[in-house]
């Protein structure tokens, strides 16, 4: 590890990217100083296990380049912004493992589109962040490299699968991070750590360079301290991409400019969500209080029926495991990644490498996905789940044709203690009951902080919007 050779007189306090840019131009801090502070913060809070690796050398080199650009007034919109990457996003010349033994030591051969776009605006990539293995989990207990601790209460989980990304922001280890969201993997950890987590519309941000879990659900997004920073990052990362045919051709909005426009909206909340037996009473109260405040601010707020709540989680897990069983078939011990030393022939190489390389939860989902795609059960499970997905899409879009937004709690409760749900897969899966809807449908959704529970942990509020209307979504989120 390369260390800088100057002393920091005062540690810089990060608030927003906009303020950071002003302070860099005014000479109140430098990119080199910011990188050193970040490296020291990560080291001092190493026990949180948020970072799997710190890219010290490349970050320091980038900081020096950006400092020169600032002096010559040619720096980009993210000059000096220190960003952490979830360990399933590729950065050329750097390791990426999806927090799995099967990819341990694998080095990216190219950079993801999002990384290229961030670097083009002079961002500084500081390292890769721990997550649930192959983004499969809701607690960050499934990583092959150890669990991540919630800095707000180290006995509790940070959420998953982007737990390391949320913790890095909440614990001030870096300024902002990227995660991926397949069923709530950005929004749930954001809720558990008191940060802002944005899942854009499916296709708004290119998935090129994101190691796939479930291709029709996955979406990259930011975790930040403020809605303003999420808006700026989305503006920079969004847009068409020749390497990803699912990336939308739609024009990218000016999300930061429209953020503070005074707008009033028509908002729906799902009655079944706020009346759910599994919803914590304080989470319910905070949700209803926020809806009342929105009403008092001039917004129209009405409850609507959503009869498919109980079908969300089963539909999600049938379809995502099916896609995962296909996507993860490439990790076979032959092409790249872990190869079992105990294999004697090609067949045993496949079997032993996958059995030894994948963790318990990943193997569970691969087996479930293979089962629902098998000839005897395809119609009974996979085909039926696709039909239910269409029903959920139709109903959600019907609501969004009459209302601008759908508001729900982000999660049924606050961060839970380690081990509480890990032996009960169904109970763990139900942690995603409010977040999976946006991925099933493909619409954008954001989790914003919504007060503190009596147990001292943060509560999140989720807002879902119409496809590609992130400008309005961010505007409302900024009002809360």
Question: How does the language model describe each region?
Answer:
Residues 44, 171-177, 182-277, 288-297, ...:
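Structural helix-boundary/capping segments
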Residues 27, 86, 226:
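Short, conserved phosphate/pyrophosphate- and ester-handling motifs at nucleotide-, phospho-/glycolipid
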Residues 79-220, 270-272, 322, 408-426:
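Short glycine/serine-rich loop/turn segments
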